[in-house]
Protein backbone atom coordinates (compact mmCIF):
# COMPACT_ATOMS: atom_id res chain seq x y z
CA UNK A 1 0.00 0.00 0.00
CA UNK A 2 2.85 2.32 0.76
CA UNK A 3 4.31 1.66 -2.66
CA UNK A 4 1.01 2.49 -4.34
CA UNK A 5 0.66 5.69 -2.39
CA UNK A 6 4.18 6.68 -3.27
CA UNK A 7 3.67 5.93 -6.96
CA UNK A 8 0.46 7.93 -7.01
CA UNK A 9 2.24 10.89 -5.46
CA UNK A 10 5.01 10.91 -8.04
CA UNK A 11 2.90 12.41 -10.80
CA UNK A 12 1.90 15.61 -8.97
CA UNK A 13 5.45 16.02 -7.71
CA UNK A 14 6.84 15.65 -11.18
CA UNK A 15 4.26 17.96 -12.69
CA UNK A 16 4.79 20.58 -10.00
CA UNK A 17 8.30 21.09 -11.30
CA UNK A 18 6.93 21.57 -14.81
CA UNK A 19 4.32 24.26 -14.32
CA UNK A 20 4.73 25.46 -17.90
CA UNK A 21 4.27 22.05 -19.50
CA UNK A 22 1.95 21.87 -22.46
CA UNK A 23 -1.63 20.96 -21.58
CA UNK A 24 -4.20 20.49 -24.32
CA UNK A 25 -7.13 19.68 -22.06
CA UNK A 26 -8.77 20.85 -18.84
CA UNK A 27 -9.98 18.54 -16.07
CA UNK A 28 -13.12 19.46 -14.14
CA UNK A 29 -13.43 17.87 -10.67
CA UNK A 30 -16.98 18.89 -9.82
CA UNK A 31 -18.34 17.20 -6.69
CA UNK A 32 -21.80 17.02 -8.29
CA UNK A 33 -20.50 14.71 -11.02
CA UNK A 34 -20.28 11.61 -8.79
CA UNK A 35 -16.54 11.92 -8.46
CA UNK A 36 -15.91 11.33 -12.18
CA UNK A 37 -13.63 14.01 -13.69
CA UNK A 38 -14.71 15.40 -17.06
CA UNK A 39 -12.00 16.29 -19.57
CA UNK A 40 -12.63 19.31 -21.79
CA UNK A 41 -10.41 19.34 -24.85
CA UNK A 42 -10.70 22.69 -26.66
CA UNK A 43 -9.35 21.04 -29.84
CA UNK A 44 -11.84 18.16 -29.71
CA UNK A 45 -13.61 19.01 -32.98
CA UNK A 46 -10.28 19.81 -34.64
CA UNK A 47 -8.94 16.35 -33.79
CA UNK A 48 -12.23 14.77 -34.79
CA UNK A 49 -12.16 16.47 -38.18
CA UNK A 50 -8.50 15.50 -38.69
CA UNK A 51 -9.18 11.79 -38.07
CA UNK A 52 -12.57 11.45 -39.74
CA UNK A 53 -12.21 13.75 -42.75
CA UNK A 54 -8.49 14.29 -43.40
CA UNK A 55 -8.98 15.76 -46.89
CA UNK A 56 -11.37 18.46 -45.67
CA UNK A 57 -9.12 19.15 -42.69
CA UNK A 58 -5.99 19.50 -44.83
CA UNK A 59 -7.72 21.82 -47.29
CA UNK A 60 -8.95 24.00 -44.43
CA UNK A 61 -5.51 24.30 -42.84
CA UNK A 62 -3.53 24.76 -46.06
CA UNK A 63 -5.89 27.50 -47.27
CA UNK A 64 -5.11 29.46 -44.11
CA UNK A 65 -1.37 28.78 -44.39
CA UNK A 66 -1.33 30.30 -47.87
CA UNK A 67 -3.11 33.33 -46.43
CA UNK A 68 -0.09 33.98 -44.19
CA UNK A 69 2.85 32.98 -46.38
CA UNK A 70 3.40 33.10 -50.13
CA UNK A 71 3.95 29.61 -51.53
CA UNK A 72 4.43 29.38 -55.32
CA UNK A 73 2.99 26.41 -57.18
CA UNK A 74 5.98 24.10 -56.73
CA UNK A 75 6.42 24.85 -53.03
CA UNK A 76 2.71 24.43 -52.42
CA UNK A 77 2.82 21.08 -54.21
CA UNK A 78 5.74 20.07 -51.96
CA UNK A 79 3.75 21.03 -48.88
CA UNK A 80 0.88 18.87 -50.10
CA UNK A 81 3.28 15.99 -50.80
CA UNK A 82 2.59 15.99 -54.53
CA UNK A 83 6.24 16.50 -55.58
CA UNK A 84 9.58 15.72 -53.91
CA UNK A 85 11.76 18.37 -52.34
CA UNK A 86 14.55 19.72 -54.56
CA UNK A 87 17.65 20.78 -52.66
CA UNK A 88 20.68 22.86 -53.71
CA UNK A 89 23.75 21.01 -54.97
CA UNK A 90 21.70 18.13 -56.36
CA UNK A 91 21.25 16.65 -52.89
CA UNK A 92 17.95 15.16 -51.98
CA UNK A 93 16.26 12.60 -49.82
CA UNK A 94 16.91 8.96 -50.52
CA UNK A 95 14.70 7.26 -53.05
CA UNK A 96 11.55 5.58 -51.88
CA UNK A 97 12.84 2.10 -52.80
CA UNK A 98 16.01 2.36 -50.69
CA UNK A 99 14.12 3.93 -47.79
CA UNK A 100 11.63 1.09 -47.81
CA UNK A 101 14.37 -1.54 -48.04
CA UNK A 102 16.34 -0.06 -45.13
CA UNK A 103 13.20 0.32 -43.04
CA UNK A 104 12.22 -3.29 -43.72
CA UNK A 105 15.61 -4.58 -42.55
CA UNK A 106 15.44 -2.53 -39.36
CA UNK A 107 11.87 -3.63 -38.73
CA UNK A 108 12.87 -7.27 -38.95
CA UNK A 109 15.49 -6.65 -36.27
CA UNK A 110 12.94 -4.76 -34.12
CA UNK A 111 15.14 -1.68 -33.85
CA UNK A 112 13.88 1.86 -33.41
CA UNK A 113 17.05 3.74 -34.34
CA UNK A 114 17.02 4.58 -38.04
CA UNK A 115 13.44 3.34 -38.54
CA UNK A 116 10.48 5.51 -39.53
CA UNK A 117 8.90 7.18 -36.55
CA UNK A 118 6.15 5.20 -34.84
CA UNK A 119 4.21 5.50 -31.60
CA UNK A 120 6.05 2.42 -30.27
CA UNK A 121 9.38 4.10 -30.91
CA UNK A 122 8.18 7.26 -29.19
CA UNK A 123 7.16 5.21 -26.15
CA UNK A 124 10.73 3.90 -25.86
CA UNK A 125 12.36 7.30 -26.40
CA UNK A 126 10.03 8.86 -23.85
CA UNK A 127 12.08 7.14 -21.14
CA UNK A 128 15.02 9.35 -22.13
CA UNK A 129 12.92 12.52 -22.20
CA UNK A 130 11.39 11.78 -18.82
CA UNK A 131 14.82 11.23 -17.26
CA UNK A 132 16.24 14.44 -18.73
CA UNK A 133 13.39 16.49 -17.24
CA UNK A 134 14.77 15.56 -13.84
CA UNK A 135 18.34 16.57 -14.69
CA UNK A 136 18.01 19.95 -16.41
CA UNK A 137 20.64 21.64 -14.24
CA UNK A 138 23.57 19.65 -15.64
CA UNK A 139 26.01 22.09 -17.21
CA UNK A 140 26.49 21.68 -20.95
CA UNK A 141 23.47 19.41 -21.33
CA UNK A 142 23.06 18.39 -25.03
CA UNK A 143 26.44 19.96 -25.80
CA UNK A 144 28.90 17.78 -23.87
CA UNK A 145 29.11 14.26 -25.38
CA UNK A 146 28.66 11.23 -23.16
CA UNK A 147 30.51 7.94 -22.90
CA UNK A 148 30.24 5.94 -26.14
CA UNK A 149 30.30 2.54 -24.37
CA UNK A 150 27.42 3.42 -22.06
CA UNK A 151 25.54 4.91 -24.99
CA UNK A 152 25.83 1.65 -26.96
CA UNK A 153 24.49 -0.35 -24.02
CA UNK A 154 21.58 2.03 -23.69
CA UNK A 155 20.95 1.96 -27.44
CA UNK A 156 20.77 -1.85 -27.52
CA UNK A 157 18.37 -1.89 -24.60
CA UNK A 158 16.03 0.54 -26.36
CA UNK A 159 16.18 -1.43 -29.63
CA UNK A 160 15.26 -4.60 -27.73
CA UNK A 161 12.27 -2.88 -26.19
CA UNK A 162 13.32 -3.45 -22.60
CA UNK A 163 12.57 -1.11 -19.76
CA UNK A 164 15.62 0.75 -18.50
CA UNK A 165 16.32 1.85 -14.97
CA UNK A 166 17.99 5.17 -15.66
CA UNK A 167 17.85 6.08 -11.96
CA UNK A 168 20.31 3.30 -11.07
CA UNK A 169 23.28 5.62 -11.66
CA UNK A 170 24.71 3.45 -14.43
CA UNK A 171 24.16 6.18 -17.04
CA UNK A 172 25.01 9.88 -16.99
CA UNK A 173 22.72 12.70 -18.14
CA UNK A 174 25.10 13.48 -21.00
CA UNK A 175 24.82 9.85 -22.19
CA UNK A 176 21.05 10.12 -22.34
CA UNK A 177 21.07 13.58 -23.99
CA UNK A 178 23.53 12.47 -26.67
CA UNK A 179 21.53 9.32 -27.39
CA UNK A 180 18.38 11.40 -27.87
CA UNK A 181 20.16 13.52 -30.48
CA UNK A 182 21.42 10.34 -32.19
CA UNK A 183 17.88 8.98 -32.42
CA UNK A 184 16.65 12.18 -34.11
CA UNK A 185 19.66 12.30 -36.42
CA UNK A 186 19.08 8.73 -37.67
CA UNK A 187 15.43 9.23 -38.60
CA UNK A 188 14.80 8.70 -42.36
CA UNK A 189 13.69 12.33 -42.63
CA UNK A 190 13.82 15.34 -40.31
CA UNK A 191 11.26 15.55 -37.56
CA UNK A 192 9.48 18.42 -39.35
CA UNK A 193 9.56 16.42 -42.64
CA UNK A 194 10.93 17.37 -46.04
CA UNK A 195 7.53 18.60 -47.23
CA UNK A 196 7.52 21.49 -44.75
CA UNK A 197 11.07 22.70 -45.38
CA UNK A 198 10.25 25.63 -47.70
CA UNK A 199 7.28 26.66 -45.56
CA UNK A 200 9.56 27.08 -42.54
CA UNK A 201 11.91 29.27 -44.57
CA UNK A 202 8.97 31.50 -45.51
CA UNK A 203 7.77 31.69 -41.91
CA UNK A 204 11.20 32.91 -40.81
CA UNK A 205 10.81 35.79 -43.31
CA UNK A 206 7.53 37.07 -41.84
CA UNK A 207 8.28 40.64 -40.82
CA UNK A 208 6.21 43.53 -39.56
CA UNK A 209 5.14 46.46 -41.77
CA UNK A 210 5.37 50.13 -40.88
CA UNK A 211 2.57 52.70 -41.15
CA UNK A 212 3.35 53.25 -44.83
CA UNK A 213 3.11 49.55 -45.65
CA UNK A 214 6.84 49.00 -46.01
CA UNK A 215 8.40 45.79 -44.75
CA UNK A 216 10.66 46.21 -41.73
CA UNK A 217 13.35 44.01 -40.18
CA UNK A 218 11.25 43.32 -37.08
CA UNK A 219 9.88 39.76 -36.98
CA UNK A 220 6.10 39.50 -36.88
CA UNK A 221 5.85 37.09 -33.96
CA UNK A 222 2.08 36.79 -33.98
CA UNK A 223 1.93 35.76 -37.62
CA UNK A 224 4.88 33.40 -37.15
CA UNK A 225 3.17 31.67 -34.23
CA UNK A 226 -0.09 31.41 -36.16
CA UNK A 227 1.66 29.95 -39.20
CA UNK A 228 3.53 27.40 -37.07
CA UNK A 229 0.30 26.41 -35.33
CA UNK A 230 -1.26 25.68 -38.71
CA UNK A 231 1.80 23.89 -40.04
CA UNK A 232 2.05 21.62 -37.01
CA UNK A 233 -1.60 20.62 -37.48
CA UNK A 234 -0.78 18.82 -40.73
CA UNK A 235 2.30 17.00 -39.46
CA UNK A 236 2.01 13.20 -39.27
CA UNK A 237 0.69 12.32 -35.78
CA UNK A 238 3.91 10.57 -34.60
CA UNK A 239 6.03 13.53 -35.72
CA UNK A 240 3.73 16.00 -34.03
CA UNK A 241 3.66 14.05 -30.78
CA UNK A 242 7.44 13.68 -30.55
CA UNK A 243 7.98 17.32 -31.57
CA UNK A 244 5.68 18.40 -28.77
CA UNK A 245 7.64 16.36 -26.21
CA UNK A 246 11.00 17.55 -27.56
CA UNK A 247 10.18 21.27 -27.67
CA UNK A 248 8.76 21.12 -24.17
CA UNK A 249 12.00 19.51 -22.95
CA UNK A 250 14.13 22.15 -24.67
CA UNK A 251 11.90 24.94 -23.34
CA UNK A 252 12.36 23.71 -19.78
CA UNK A 253 16.11 23.34 -20.39
CA UNK A 254 16.40 26.94 -21.61
CA UNK A 255 14.60 28.15 -18.48
CA UNK A 256 17.45 26.70 -16.42
CA UNK A 257 20.18 28.32 -18.52
CA UNK A 258 21.63 30.01 -15.45
CA UNK A 259 22.60 26.50 -14.28
CA UNK A 260 23.18 24.50 -17.49
CA UNK A 261 24.53 27.39 -19.61
CA UNK A 262 22.27 26.36 -22.50
CA UNK A 263 20.14 29.16 -23.95
CA UNK A 264 17.38 28.67 -26.50
CA UNK A 265 19.72 29.64 -29.34
CA UNK A 266 22.46 27.29 -28.13
CA UNK A 267 19.94 24.46 -28.05
CA UNK A 268 18.76 25.45 -31.54
CA UNK A 269 22.29 25.02 -32.87
CA UNK A 270 22.32 21.47 -31.45
CA UNK A 271 18.90 20.38 -32.74
CA UNK A 272 18.21 22.33 -35.96
CA UNK A 273 20.16 19.79 -38.10
CA UNK A 274 17.98 16.96 -36.75
CA UNK A 275 14.63 18.77 -36.69
CA UNK A 276 14.72 21.11 -39.70
CA UNK A 277 17.59 20.31 -42.03
CA UNK A 278 16.84 17.96 -44.92
CA UNK A 279 18.78 14.72 -44.94
CA UNK A 280 21.94 14.24 -47.02
CA UNK A 281 22.81 17.95 -47.08
CA UNK A 282 25.73 19.82 -45.59
CA UNK A 283 26.11 23.28 -44.10
CA UNK A 284 27.58 24.47 -47.42
CA UNK A 285 24.38 23.45 -49.22
CA UNK A 286 22.33 25.53 -46.78
CA UNK A 287 24.73 28.44 -46.30
CA UNK A 288 22.14 30.96 -47.50
CA UNK A 289 19.42 29.64 -45.18
CA UNK A 290 21.34 28.26 -42.21
CA UNK A 291 20.80 31.43 -40.16
CA UNK A 292 17.06 31.35 -40.86
CA UNK A 293 16.86 27.69 -39.85
CA UNK A 294 18.75 28.20 -36.60
CA UNK A 295 16.70 31.30 -35.72
CA UNK A 296 13.51 29.44 -36.59
CA UNK A 297 14.45 26.59 -34.28
CA UNK A 298 15.21 29.01 -31.44
CA UNK A 299 11.85 30.71 -32.02
CA UNK A 300 10.04 27.36 -31.74
CA UNK A 301 11.80 26.60 -28.45
CA UNK A 302 10.91 29.99 -26.93
CA UNK A 303 7.24 29.84 -27.97
CA UNK A 304 6.69 26.09 -27.72
CA UNK A 305 3.87 26.49 -25.18
CA UNK A 306 1.71 28.26 -27.78
CA UNK A 307 2.44 26.24 -30.91
CA UNK A 308 0.34 23.13 -30.29
CA UNK A 309 -2.99 24.87 -29.92
CA UNK A 310 -5.22 25.20 -32.95
CA UNK A 311 -6.06 28.82 -33.85
CA UNK A 312 -9.47 29.92 -32.62
CA UNK A 313 -10.94 30.20 -36.13
CA UNK A 314 -9.85 26.63 -36.95
CA UNK A 315 -11.62 25.43 -33.80
CA UNK A 316 -14.72 27.36 -34.82
CA UNK A 317 -14.67 25.97 -38.36
CA UNK A 318 -14.37 22.42 -37.06
CA UNK A 319 -17.15 22.98 -34.55
CA UNK A 320 -19.49 24.44 -37.15
CA UNK A 321 -18.73 21.54 -39.48
CA UNK A 322 -20.10 19.05 -36.97
CA UNK A 323 -23.02 21.23 -35.93
CA UNK A 324 -24.36 21.20 -39.47
CA UNK A 325 -23.64 24.87 -40.15
CA UNK A 326 -21.78 26.38 -43.08
CA UNK A 327 -18.03 25.80 -42.83
CA UNK A 328 -15.96 28.95 -43.23
CA UNK A 329 -12.73 28.56 -45.15
CA UNK A 330 -10.63 31.18 -43.44
CA UNK A 331 -10.25 33.52 -40.50
CA UNK A 332 -11.52 36.44 -42.59
CA UNK A 333 -14.85 34.68 -43.19
CA UNK A 334 -15.43 34.21 -39.47
CA UNK A 335 -14.49 37.83 -38.72
CA UNK A 336 -16.94 39.01 -41.39
CA UNK A 337 -19.77 36.89 -40.03
CA UNK A 338 -19.12 38.06 -36.48
CA UNK A 339 -19.20 41.68 -37.68
CA UNK A 340 -22.49 41.13 -39.54
CA UNK A 341 -24.08 39.55 -36.48
CA UNK A 342 -23.00 42.49 -34.33
CA UNK A 343 -24.38 45.08 -36.76
CA UNK A 344 -27.67 43.18 -37.14
CA UNK A 345 -28.06 42.96 -33.38
CA UNK A 346 -27.38 46.68 -32.93
CA UNK A 347 -29.86 47.58 -35.69
CA UNK A 348 -32.58 45.37 -34.24
CA UNK A 349 -31.94 46.81 -30.79
CA UNK A 350 -32.21 50.38 -32.13
CA UNK A 351 -35.46 49.61 -33.97
CA UNK A 352 -36.94 48.02 -30.86
CA UNK A 353 -35.98 51.07 -28.77
CA UNK A 354 -37.63 53.41 -31.32
CA UNK A 355 -40.83 51.37 -31.26
CA UNK A 356 -40.94 51.43 -27.48
CA UNK A 357 -40.35 55.19 -27.38
CA UNK A 358 -43.08 55.89 -29.95
CA UNK A 359 -45.78 53.74 -28.29
CA UNK A 360 -46.62 56.17 -25.42
CA UNK A 361 -46.87 59.07 -27.86
CA UNK A 362 -49.23 57.17 -30.19
CA UNK A 363 -51.44 56.03 -27.31
CA UNK A 364 -51.70 59.58 -25.95
CA UNK A 365 -52.65 60.97 -29.38
CA UNK A 366 -55.28 58.28 -29.87
CA UNK A 367 -56.77 58.99 -26.45
CA UNK A 368 -57.20 62.71 -27.17
CA UNK A 369 -58.75 61.93 -30.57
CA UNK A 370 -61.31 59.56 -29.04
CA UNK A 371 -62.23 62.10 -26.35
CA UNK A 372 -62.82 64.85 -28.93
CA UNK A 373 -64.92 62.59 -31.14
CA UNK A 374 -67.03 61.44 -28.21
CA UNK A 375 -67.75 65.02 -27.16
CA UNK A 376 -68.63 65.98 -30.73
CA UNK A 377 -71.01 63.08 -31.24
CA UNK A 378 -72.62 63.66 -27.82
CA UNK A 379 -73.29 67.25 -28.86
CA UNK A 380 -74.94 66.09 -32.11
CA UNK A 381 -76.94 63.48 -30.21
CA UNK A 382 -78.35 66.13 -27.84
CA UNK A 383 -79.53 68.35 -30.71
CA UNK A 384 -83.31 68.49 -31.34
CA UNK A 385 -84.70 66.62 -34.33
CA UNK A 386 -84.05 68.69 -37.43
CA UNK A 387 -82.74 68.52 -40.98
CA UNK A 388 -79.39 69.79 -39.73
CA UNK A 389 -79.10 66.89 -37.28
CA UNK A 390 -79.87 64.33 -40.02
CA UNK A 391 -77.27 65.93 -42.28
CA UNK A 392 -74.60 65.62 -39.59
CA UNK A 393 -75.52 61.98 -39.01
CA UNK A 394 -75.09 61.29 -42.74
CA UNK A 395 -71.65 62.88 -42.65
CA UNK A 396 -70.65 60.66 -39.73
CA UNK A 397 -71.82 57.58 -41.63
CA UNK A 398 -69.81 58.59 -44.69
CA UNK A 399 -66.69 58.74 -42.52
CA UNK A 400 -67.02 54.99 -41.92
CA UNK A 401 -65.25 54.52 -45.26
CA UNK A 402 -62.11 56.27 -44.02
CA UNK A 403 -59.73 55.23 -41.26
CA UNK A 404 -58.84 57.15 -38.17
CA UNK A 405 -55.89 59.45 -38.93
CA UNK A 406 -52.61 58.24 -37.49
CA UNK A 407 -53.89 54.68 -36.92
CA UNK A 408 -53.28 52.85 -40.19
CA UNK A 409 -53.57 49.10 -39.61
CA UNK A 410 -50.93 46.85 -41.07
CA UNK A 411 -51.67 44.82 -44.20
CA UNK A 412 -51.38 41.56 -42.35
CA UNK A 413 -53.99 42.65 -39.77
CA UNK A 414 -56.45 43.75 -42.45
CA UNK A 415 -56.08 40.50 -44.36
CA UNK A 416 -56.30 38.35 -41.26
CA UNK A 417 -59.24 39.87 -39.36
CA UNK A 418 -60.58 42.61 -41.67
CA UNK A 419 -61.03 45.06 -38.80
CA UNK A 420 -62.15 48.63 -39.38
CA UNK A 421 -61.09 51.54 -37.20
CA UNK A 422 -63.61 54.10 -38.57
CA UNK A 423 -64.88 57.35 -37.08
CA UNK A 424 -68.41 56.05 -36.87
CA UNK A 425 -67.45 52.73 -35.30
CA UNK A 426 -65.21 54.49 -32.81
CA UNK A 427 -67.91 56.98 -31.80
CA UNK A 428 -70.65 54.39 -31.43
CA UNK A 429 -68.40 52.18 -29.35
CA UNK A 430 -67.70 55.03 -26.91
CA UNK A 431 -71.17 56.60 -26.76
CA UNK A 432 -73.64 53.73 -27.08
CA UNK A 433 -71.64 51.26 -25.02
CA UNK A 434 -72.72 48.19 -27.02
CA UNK A 435 -73.22 45.32 -24.57
CA UNK A 436 -72.69 42.68 -27.27
CA UNK A 437 -69.01 43.55 -27.70
CA UNK A 438 -66.26 41.85 -25.73
CA UNK A 439 -63.48 43.79 -24.06
CA UNK A 440 -61.22 43.15 -27.04
CA UNK A 441 -63.84 44.35 -29.54
CA UNK A 442 -64.22 47.57 -27.60
CA UNK A 443 -60.70 48.51 -28.73
CA UNK A 444 -60.90 47.00 -32.25
CA UNK A 445 -64.54 46.85 -33.56
CA UNK A 446 -65.20 44.51 -36.46
CA UNK A 447 -67.17 45.58 -39.54
CA UNK A 448 -69.98 43.18 -38.52
CA UNK A 449 -70.44 44.85 -35.14
CA UNK A 450 -70.39 48.29 -36.74
CA UNK A 451 -73.04 47.23 -39.21
CA UNK A 452 -75.27 45.70 -36.49
CA UNK A 453 -75.09 48.84 -34.41
CA UNK A 454 -76.01 50.99 -37.37
CA UNK A 455 -78.91 48.71 -38.32
CA UNK A 456 -80.30 48.96 -34.81
CA UNK A 457 -80.19 52.70 -34.58
CA UNK A 458 -80.24 54.26 -38.04
CA UNK A 459 -83.01 54.99 -40.43
CA UNK A 460 -83.64 53.04 -43.61
CA UNK A 461 -81.95 55.73 -45.63
CA UNK A 462 -78.80 55.56 -43.54
CA UNK A 463 -78.77 51.76 -43.62
CA UNK A 464 -78.87 51.78 -47.41
CA UNK A 465 -76.10 54.32 -47.49
CA UNK A 466 -73.97 52.25 -45.12
CA UNK A 467 -74.30 48.97 -47.02
CA UNK A 468 -73.92 50.52 -50.45
CA UNK A 469 -70.81 52.48 -49.54
CA UNK A 470 -68.81 50.11 -47.33
CA UNK A 471 -67.41 47.10 -49.17
CA UNK A 472 -65.71 45.89 -45.99
CA UNK A 473 -69.02 45.22 -44.17
CA UNK A 474 -70.44 41.70 -44.40
CA UNK A 475 -73.62 40.41 -42.74
CA UNK A 476 -74.24 36.78 -41.94
CA UNK A 477 -77.85 35.48 -42.37
CA UNK A 478 -78.21 34.91 -38.62
CA UNK A 479 -77.23 38.45 -37.67
CA UNK A 480 -79.34 39.94 -40.44
CA UNK A 481 -82.39 38.05 -39.23
CA UNK A 482 -81.77 39.13 -35.63
CA UNK A 483 -81.38 42.73 -36.68
CA UNK A 484 -84.57 42.72 -38.77
CA UNK A 485 -86.51 41.28 -35.85
CA UNK A 486 -85.41 44.12 -33.63
CA UNK A 487 -86.01 47.00 -36.00
CA UNK A 488 -89.73 47.20 -35.22
CA UNK A 489 -90.16 49.58 -32.34
CA UNK A 490 -86.61 50.91 -32.74
CA UNK A 491 -86.71 53.18 -35.74
CA UNK A 492 -83.59 55.08 -34.79
CA UNK A 493 -81.18 55.77 -32.03
CA UNK A 494 -81.60 59.52 -32.11
UniProtKB/Swiss-Prot annotation:
GO terms for biological process: regulation of small GTPase mediated signal transduction; signal transduction. The modification Phosphothreonine is found at residue 478. The keyword Phosphoprotein applies. Keywords: Acetylation, GTPase activation, Nucleus, Phosphoprotein. Its main location: nucleus. GO terms for cellular component: cytoplasm; cytosol; intracellular membrane-bounded organelle; nucleus; plasma membrane. Residues 102-308 form the Rho-GAP domain. Residues 354-368 have a biased composition (Basic and acidic residues). The modification Phosphoserine is found at residues 7, 31, 422, 438, 470. The keyword Acetylation applies. Strong expression in fetal heart, brain, placenta, lung, liver, skeletal muscle, kidney and pancreas. Weak expression in adult pancreas, spleen, thymus, and ovary. The record marks 143 as: Arginine finger. GO terms for molecular function: GTPase activator activity. Residues 349-368, 399-421 are annotated as: Disordered. It holds the Pfam family RhoGAP. CDD domains: RhoGAP_ARHGAP19. Residues 399-415 have a biased composition (Polar residues). It is found in: Nucleus. The modification N-acetylalanine is found at residue 2. GTPase activator for the Rho-type GTPases by converting them to an inactive GDP-bound state. This is Rho GTPase-activating protein 19. It comes from Homo sapiens (Human). The gene is ARHGAP19.
Amino acid sequence: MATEAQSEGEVPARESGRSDAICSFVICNDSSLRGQPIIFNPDFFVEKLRHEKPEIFTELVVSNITRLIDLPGTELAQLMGEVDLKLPGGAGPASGFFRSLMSLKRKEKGVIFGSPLTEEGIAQIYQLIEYLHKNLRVEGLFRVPGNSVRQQILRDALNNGTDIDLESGEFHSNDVATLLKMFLGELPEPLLTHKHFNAHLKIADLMQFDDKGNKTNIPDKDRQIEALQLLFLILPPPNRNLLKLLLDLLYQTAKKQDKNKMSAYNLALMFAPHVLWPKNVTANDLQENITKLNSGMAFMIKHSQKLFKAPAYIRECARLHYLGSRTQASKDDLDLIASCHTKSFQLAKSQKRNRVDSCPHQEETQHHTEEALRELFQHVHDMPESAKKKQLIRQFNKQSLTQTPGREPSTSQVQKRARSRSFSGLIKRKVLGNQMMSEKKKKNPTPESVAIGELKGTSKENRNLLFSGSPAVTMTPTRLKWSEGKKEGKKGFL
